[in-house]
Amino acid sequence: MSKPIHIIGGGLAGTEAAWQLARRGLACTLHEMRPVRPTPAHQTDRLAELVCSNSLKSESESTAPWLLKEELRRLDSLLLQCAQKARVPGGHALTVDRDIFAREVTAAITAEPLITLLRDEVSSLSADAIWIVASGPLTSGPLAEEIARLTGSGRLYFYDSISPIVDAESVDTSIAWWASRYGKSTDGTDDYLNCPLDRGQYEHFVDELLKADSVSAHIPEDNTCYFEACLPIEEIARRGRDTLRFGPMKPMGLDDPRTGRRPWAVVQLRQENLRAESFNLVGFQNHMKFPEQKRVLRLIPGLQNAEFLRYGQIHRNTYINAPALLTAALNLRARPEIFFAGQISGVEGYVESIATGLMAGIHAAALATGDTPRPLPRQTALGSLCHYVSGADPKDYQPANITFDLLPQLEEAERQRLRRDKKARHALVCQRALEALEEYRHAIV
């Protein structure tokens, strides 16, 4: 008889791991501490609640985010299926209605007889079970202490922040206009509301942003560590006055229909749900105090009367030093029955969390049935992500998104042949990845 299997955390990684185990005929227990113990960032007790953006990144073929999602689809990811059901317009990105998405995942998990959902907090990991730790960036203190004890290391962290959401009816559409950058959209529609700023408006906005009161991170400012792909706008502005308009406020590919010209800067709003009743400010994660957010963000033309349904917030993300601890199968070298998945393993991004959850579920199933977990080939995005998690330099381990830099390079002859065609190089990498994935699928069936 195999050991019982427990999964800690009902987020993206934990729910995907549970589903993969159930698909292989294995019973498991999924522990989610909400609502018994709430977190600073979650609003509901639903599984797989998205607390930051509602975008699962690019669906443009032969990009790294597309490749990772395509591999997940081919391995029957539950969460990618739910994302498709909850999809809303989002340009070339897979964007979801976060409420529908969480409801779909919760319904699927609770309806699966092989998954037992317990609403409780886990603070210790017994030796007589297989564990998948997918407790996320907001891991509770007692569990974090247990993980530190098991791994013999202290915690690592960085600070992350979430974007504000505004009521759609409060946006002035006589100023804001619908468009996708360069007209790019998966279905040919204009998926973003765009708020233009001229140079004077932009300079005034930056001045007020830099003066705004922020919520204390509770540690000295010079010790604060942010994930570079999700910087608060205040931090971006501190790096230079024009940094914002070359980042989240870049105007490229967006001409104001009122003037026929490109604005000095643009703030993009992306719809939050299918009914387009609310919008999030794309890339506008911040940790200004709430009254300051209202004051400063209402300086943006089109948002002068904005009603905020959610303000930006900052929260601390926790992750282990995975390269010093984990194998490419995402389990501890010293305790092979304990797996890690999601952001606590040191990946950053929704799809990356789903990916590590899926792989941890597959590998835990192999271990539970007496087989040796078999990591994916390095040629795949999934394999490369797990290779990074287990094989990066442990001295300076930083969370990673999926990029082509993580995948193996093409041979020198192929690089030379396609040196002037990056799209063709990426397409070839994707082709080889999917071929390797198909071989892996046939081998593990």
From Swiss-Prot:
Cellular component, GO annotation: cytosol
Secretion signal, residue range per the UniProt entry: none
Names of required cofactors: FAD
Single GO MF descriptor: flavin adenine dinucleotide binding
Localization terms from the record: Cytoplasm
Catalysis: reaction(s): uridine(54) in tRNA + (6R)-5,10-methylene-5,6,7,8-tetrahydrofolate + NADH + H(+) = 5-methyluridine(54) in tRNA + (6S)-5,6,7,8-tetrahydrofolate + NAD(+); uridine(54) in tRNA + (6R)-5,10-methylene-5,6,7,8-tetrahydrofolate + NADPH + H(+) = 5-methyluridine(54) in tRNA + (6S)-5,6,7,8-tetrahydrofolate + NADP(+)
Keyword Transmembrane appears in the UniProt entry: no
Residues annotated as binding FAD: 9-14
GO biological process, one term: tRNA wobble uridine modification
Classification via SUPFAM superfamilies: FAD/NAD(P)-binding domain
Enzyme class: transferase
Domain of life of the native organism: Bacteria
Keywords, comma-separated and alphabetical: Cytoplasm, FAD, Flavoprotein, Methyltransferase, NAD, NADP, Transferase, tRNA processing
Entry's EC annotation: 2.1.1.74
UniProt-listed Gene3D superfamilies: FAD/NAD(P)-binding domain (3.50.50.60)
PANTHER family (alphabetical): GLUCOSE INHIBITED DIVISION PROTEIN A, METHYLENETETRAHYDROFOLATE--TRNA-(URACIL-5-)-METHYLTRANSFERASE TRMFO
Family affiliation: Belongs to the MnmG family. TrmFO subfamily.
Function: Catalyzes the folate-dependent formation of 5-methyl-uridine at position 54 (M-5-U54) in all tRNAs.
Record protein name field: Methylenetetrahydrofolate--tRNA-(uracil-5-)-methyltransferase TrmFO
Gene: trmFO
